[in-house]
Amino acid sequence: MANPFENADGTYLVLVNEEGQYSLWPGFIDVPSGWTVVHEQKGREACLDYIQSHWSDMRPNSLKTVENV
């Protein structure tokens, strides 16, 4: 079986968790607990573009808070 996370023709969601980390998620798989949909189903490239334009700081939110104290 092919990896559903690498299907160039698939539709995906963009998820984010409370740490501000993003995930490209296949649209047909249930969203896991602790993750929120921030970009509805689109093609893989559109979702990757969204992630690239919105996730500019790769540090988890908890680490950003500690470093800014």
From Swiss-Prot:
It holds the Pfam family MbtH. SUPFAM superfamilies: MbtH-like. It comes from the Bacteria. One of its GO terms (biological process) is siderophore biosynthetic process. One of its GO terms (cellular component) is cytosol. SMART domains: MbtH. This is Uncharacterized protein YbdZ. It comes from Bacillus subtilis (strain 168).
